[in-house]
């Protein structure tokens, strides 16, 4: 039967109907599972970030729609498996937000963003019961990008006092790890180089955390800056009739 869009535009309920029909009528959509959709979920999340960085509202609206589609897709698969549906997802997250914002929906007081985060963490501990701090660290999702995961692990460790006293101490650790990496490189051992490089990156993340700079975003900005510089050099080489290999990035 011919599908006719609703008068006055689509709403969330219409998207659920569209997805249910896609699962019945499209061979590709029908074949998908939670696992097969993982790359698309990650890709769409990063495209949302790109739209935010571009400060383009139309692009952001479009990319948020693509990300929402992934959420609806997973909810539909779960519904078909008799596990949960989109209403359960909405109910769960709404209940969580109300419960964890007692300063808005209850009588708790929070004057600063730091107060809010303290209350948030306290409520999370109440919900999960008494946990060892190691279990808390292991609770940071392993699928996060490594820089982001490092930041969150260090942040949680610092909440129980496992941290440097001053930013200067974190800087000294970076300098120490640089020297150890140099020695590893001199040894020629790939295993040692990999280990020391990991230690150095972890130490650099610690510095970024002290200054509340997200290392993942900082590195992304640097990558974009490098690409712009490369584009400039390539343009200059073409204008000067030179080979790109003869140019430098300086």
Regions found by a protein language model. Name each.
Residues 1-2, 6-63, 69-197, 201-250:
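Flexible "arm" and connector segments at domain edges
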